[in-house]
């Protein structure tokens, strides 16, 4: 057999049959379901008098519309409340496990899956959400699907797919001070653009990737979709096994030993051929930040706002000018002088315990210097799950954030997207640890800059973007 990539191996292991048109029918091992993209799918099953084919391989959790403030009052918005209630009823009717809002395990679906050991190497994982790519951090082939596909997977536990091409991105060099997993993925998207991965599954490799914790790897894979690819993969290793061992839905005993032996066969063969390879050296990079309305609008925190006049391509210059107008920015302005109104720390990109610890380090540094969140800034920390929140509170992180002037919230997608009560007002500028900075993403007229958790805290204290490496000096 010819050398194969990790993607090739997982595809081959799950291929039921190939059609004459070149598409393949893949078996799906895990299906994550949330309240926004599942109602029509379940209703389709009802109308066709079908059942969920493998309820034990399906896990449901509400995250997009849930409130992050006092939940004893329920969900104020009627549409959001109906969506959450509908998910609960559908889960009950079809025998699917549902983690309700009062469950300590509830949270953002892409944080809950790994926490529960539902996410495993070598599996195929789908969800009606584009950031399903997060689970690729475990060496799983994971990607988002549409509502009609959600119904198809519920009914058959299979999915019709066209095989993608293979891309490998090698991230080399030791991460310098202040440079995090979020900065790595921003560097990648800044390099390849939002269409650079179109048609590919990306495998992330190299020293910098291997050095990352599992939380950091999830951050990188999470934003694969922002680089244009449908799925991202990182080869499983000892860090992967250590993270998963003992998780509620991970294999136990002899089954665990057998699973690990299989997982060790997943990494790409040494001579495997990739359709495209890219190398990015991060050794001398400062922290990064987005300036515009696309995740590819990435600059260094030491840079100035770019000028469309410096761009030769007229269409590119026009899109830059539109972004500048929307963002209310002037070319040539140092990005570290741009003032902010809001800070959001959370999301499926940066809402894990490691992210909150990194943020708390900077917040505690501010407290010791007699400082707190600037009076002109409203800042919130939203844990990615109830278990993350519980762990953070055990470590006293909530007290640090509260003392520093941050709001400490309940878990959920929150301000990552304008589908719940946490939104930006028109014209408000936000330092956000989420994954998208599109026009209106966090609220109509809201202006989003993507940064790491540490950078977000530093901006909250200063009242403007700042180089976290110099914070407090």
Curated annotation (Swiss-Prot):
Keywords: 4Fe-4S, Amino-acid biosynthesis, Branched-chain amino acid biosynthesis, Iron, Iron-sulfur, Leucine biosynthesis, Lyase, Metal-binding. It holds the Pfam family Aconitase. CDD domains: IPMI. GO terms for molecular function: 3-isopropylmalate dehydratase activity; 4 iron, 4 sulfur cluster binding; metal ion binding. InterPro entries: 3-IsopropMal_deHydase_lsu, Acnase/IPM_dHydase_lsu_aba_1/3, Acoase/IPM_deHydtase_lsu_aba, Aconitase_4Fe-4S_BS, Aconitase_4Fe-4S_dom, IPM_dehydratase_rel_enz, IPMI_cat. It catalyses: (2R,3S)-3-isopropylmalate = (2S)-2-isopropylmalate. GO terms for biological process: L-leucine biosynthetic process. Binds 1 [4Fe-4S] cluster per subunit. Signal peptide: none annotated. [4Fe-4S] cluster binds at residues 348, 413, 416. Pathway: Amino-acid biosynthesis; L-leucine biosynthesis; L-leucine from 3-methyl-2-oxobutanoate: step 2/4. It is an enzyme of class 4 (lyase). SUPFAM superfamilies: Aconitase iron-sulfur domain. Its cofactor is [4Fe-4S] cluster. Its EC number is 4.2.1.33. Heterodimer of LeuC and LeuD. Belongs to the aconitase/IPM isomerase family. LeuC type 1 subfamily. PANTHER family: 3-ISOPROPYLMALATE DEHYDRATASE, HOMOACONITASE, MITOCHONDRIAL-RELATED. HAMAP family: LeuC_type1. Catalyzes the isomerization between 2-isopropylmalate and 3-isopropylmalate, via the formation of 2-isopropylmaleate. This is 3-isopropylmalate dehydratase large subunit. It comes from Parvibaculum lavamentivorans (strain DS-1 / DSM 13023 / NCIMB 13966).
């Amino acid at each position: 057999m010819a050398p194969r990539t990790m993607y090739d191996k997982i595809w081959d292991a799950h291929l039921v049959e190939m059609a004459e048109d070149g598409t393949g029918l893949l078996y799906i091992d895990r299906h994550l379901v949330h309240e926004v993209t599942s109602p029509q799918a379940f209703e389709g099953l009802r109308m066709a008098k079908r059942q969920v084919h493998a309820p034990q391989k399906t896990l449901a959790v509400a995250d997009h519309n849930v409130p992050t403030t006092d939940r004893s009052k329920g969900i104020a918005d009627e549409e959001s409340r109906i969506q959450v209630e509908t998910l609960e009823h559908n889960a009950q009717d079809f025998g699917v496990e549902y983690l309700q809002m009062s469950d300590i395990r509830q949270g953002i679906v892409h944080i809950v899956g790994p926490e529960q050991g539902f996410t495993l190497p070598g599996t195929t994982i789908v969800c009606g959400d584009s950031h399903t790519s997060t689970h690729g951090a475990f060496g799983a082939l994971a990607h988002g699907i549409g509502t009609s596909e959600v119904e198809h997977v519920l009914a058959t536990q299979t999915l019709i797919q066209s095989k993608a091409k293979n891309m490998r991105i090698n991230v080399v060099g030791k991460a310098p001070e202040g440079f995090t997993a979020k900065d790595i993925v921003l560097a990648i998207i800044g390099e390849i653009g939002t269409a650079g991965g179109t048609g590919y599954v990306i495998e992330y490799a190299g020293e910098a990737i291997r050095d990352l914790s599992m939380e950091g790897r999830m951050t990188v894979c999470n934003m694969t979709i922002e680089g244009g690819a449908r799925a991202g993969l990182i080869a499983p290793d000892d860090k992967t096994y250590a993270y998963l061992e003992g998780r509620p839905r991970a294999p136990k005993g002899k089954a665990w030993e057998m699973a690990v032996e299989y997982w060790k066969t997943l990494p790409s063969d040494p001579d495997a051929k990739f359709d495209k390879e890219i190398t990015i050296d991060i050794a001398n990079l400062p922290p990064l930040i987005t300036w515009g309305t696309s995740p590819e609008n990435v600059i260094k925190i030491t840079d100035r706002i770019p000028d469309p006049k410096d761009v030769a391509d007229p269409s590119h210059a026009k899109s830059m000018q539109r972004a500048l107008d929307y963002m209310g920015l002037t070319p040539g302005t140092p990005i570290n002088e741009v003032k902010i109104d809001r800070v959001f720390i959370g999301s499926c990109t940066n809402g894990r315990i490691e992210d909150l610890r990194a943020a708390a380090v900077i917040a505690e540094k501010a407290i010791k210097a007699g400082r707190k969140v600037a009076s002109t800034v409203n800042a919130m920390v939203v844990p990615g799950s109830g278990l993350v929140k519980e762990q953070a509170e055990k470590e006293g992180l909530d007290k640090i954030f509260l003392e520093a002037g941050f709001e400490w919230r309940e878990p959920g997608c929150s301000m990552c997207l304008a589908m719940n009560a946490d939104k930006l007002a028109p014209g408000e500028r936000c330092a956000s640890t989420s994954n998208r900075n599109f026009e209106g993403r966090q609220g109509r007229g809201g202006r989003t800059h993507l940064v790491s958790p540490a950078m977000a805290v530093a901006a909250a204290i200063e009242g403007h973007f700042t180089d976290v490496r110099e914070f407090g000096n």
